[in-house]
Amino acid sequence: MAKVLVLYYSSWGHVEQMAKAVAEGARETGAEVALKRVPELVPDEVAKQFHYKLDQEAPIATVEELADYDAIIFGTPTRYGNMASQMKQFIDQTGGLWAKGALVGKVGSAFTSTASQHGGQETTLTSFHTVLFHHGMVVVGLPYSFAGQNGVEQVKGNSPYGATTIADGDGSRQPSEVELDGARFQGRHVAGIAAKLAG
C-alpha cells in the first residue's frame, strides 16, 4: 500500500476543493492518504480583508515529513505563471532533503488553479515539475486516458501536466465536475504508480 501526501496551498478554497478530490481519488486505490497544507504567509488582518478561506481543516505539514511518503501531489494557485509564494517558501526549505536525496525515486505530481483559461496553468505545473526533477522524483501528470481534458464544448481546466481549474478573476467560478474528475483521476493515477514503485 502506497503512502500518499496531498500537499496544497489555497487562498480562496479552489485548490482546497481540488486537493480533496485528488485525495479521494488516491484513496480509491487503497493508498494511505494524508491531506495537508503549507503555512499561510499573509497576515491575518490582510487575509480577512481579502476574504481568504480561513476555515480550512487540513493540518499544516512540516518539511521533514515529506520523506515519509511514497508520493507527494502538490497543489498551488498560480501567481503570474508560477506557484504561489506560500508554496515556494515551503519548497525552498527542502534543501536538507535534497542534500540527503530523501525524495529520490518517489513520485511527484502537481495541480493548480488560475483566474483565466490562459492564466499560466501549464507554466505553473512545468515550473513545479522542475523542482521535482531536482529532487530526483518520478514526475507524473494527467494522461490523455482521462478523456475529460479533451473537447472544447465548455470552459474547463486540466492538461497533460496536471489537473487544473479556472476560478475567474473574482474567484466566483468553482471547480466544475469535469475538473474535479480530473483531480480524482490524477490522485488514482499517481497512487497506482507509487504502489508499483514501492513494490
UniProtKB/Swiss-Prot annotation:
Source taxon at top rank: Bacteria
Residues that bind substrate: W98
InterPro entries found in the cross-reference section: Flavodoxin/NO_synth, Flavoprotein-like_sf, Flavoprotein_WrbA-like, FMN_Rdtase-like_dom, NQO
Annotated Flavodoxin-like domain residues: 4-190
E.C. no: 1.6.5.2
Obligatory cofactor(s): FMN
Cofactor info, note text: Binds 1 FMN per monomer.
Positions bound to NAD(+): W12
Family (UniProt): Belongs to the WrbA family.
The protein's name: NAD(P)H dehydrogenase (quinone)
